[in-house]
Curated annotation (Swiss-Prot):
SUPFAM superfamilies, alphabetized: L30e-like (SSF55315)
Swiss-Prot/TrEMBL induction comment: By UV irradiation, X-rays, growth arrest and alkylating agents. The induction is mediated by some kinase(s) other than PKC.
Originating species: Homo sapiens (Human)
Protein's GO biological process: apoptotic process; cellular response to ionizing radiation; cellular response to mechanical stimulus; centrosome cycle; DNA repair; negative regulation of angiogenesis; negative regulation of blood vessel endothelial cell migration; negative regulation of peptidyl-serine phosphorylation of STAT protein
InterPro entries, A to Z: GADD45, Ribosomal_eL30-like_sf, Ribosomal_eL8/eL30/eS12/Gad45
Annotated phenotype, changing L77E: Abolishes dimerization
Lineage per the UniProt record: Eukaryota, Metazoa, Chordata, Craniata, Vertebrata
Single GO term (MF): promoter-specific chromatin binding
Residues annotated with Phosphothreonine modification: T2
Subcellular location: Nucleus
Protein name: Growth arrest and DNA damage-inducible protein GADD45 alpha
Residue stretches in coiled coil: none
Phosphoprotein in keyword set: yes
Assembly and interaction partners: Interacts with MAPK14. Predominantly monomeric but also forms dimers and other oligomers as concentration increases. Interacts with GADD45GIP1. Interacts weakly with PCNA. Interacts with AURKA, likely to compete with dimerization.
């Protein structure tokens, strides 16, 4: 391995870490502003009704989910719809970490302790633009820039790994 190859690999890792951190920040803000939709079915409904307000689509699957044909068909349809409507898409390779980020608030609720509720479907997550104001969020801007750069390199659905804490 040459110095240039090592340096390029190190820069790519650092860049991916920054993108992962930006995604965590965007998800945290979206949760607090209630501008997040979770679940393949719920996401499909929202995309059908109001695609113009969706700013980011996350698709999360692990190795086991890659063998789920029905889920892969849903992913393909959602990806096609998002590409057609200029919605930024990211694929998250560690859905467990995504679940940790999204379920922090619901774990404290009474239903979680009773175990009566089925865990939510976290395979698709949409972040919408709040109607009250345009997002002037540097973390969201960084994610949108990353998605745009990935598309320029013919990587239409970039895969990121959320950093473990």
């Amino acid at each position: 391995m040459t110095l240039e190859e090592f340096s390029a690999g190190e820069q790519k890792t650092e860049r991916m870490d920054k993108v992962g951190d930006a995604l965590e920040e965007v998800l945290s803000k979206a949760l607090s502003q209630r501008t997040i939709t979770v679940g393949v079915y719920e996401a499909a409904k929202l995309l059908n009704v109001d695609p113009d307000n969706v700013v980011l689509c996350l698709l999360a699957a692990d190795e086991d989910d890659d063998r789920d044909v029905a889920l892969q068909i849903h992913f393909t349809l959602i990806q096609a719809f998002c590409c057609e409507n200029d919605i930024n898409i990211l694929r998250v390779s560690n859905p467990g970490r995504l679940a940790e980020l999204l379920l922090l608030e619901t774990d404290a609720g009474p239903a979680a302790s009773e175990g009566a509720e089925q865990p939510p479907d976290l395979h698709c997550v949409l972040v919408t633009n709040p109607h009250s104001s345009q997002w002037k969020d540097p973390a969201l801007s960084q994610l949108i820039c990353f998605c745009r750069e990935s598309r320029y390199m013919d990587q239409w659905v970039p895969v990121i790994n959320l950093p473990e804490r």
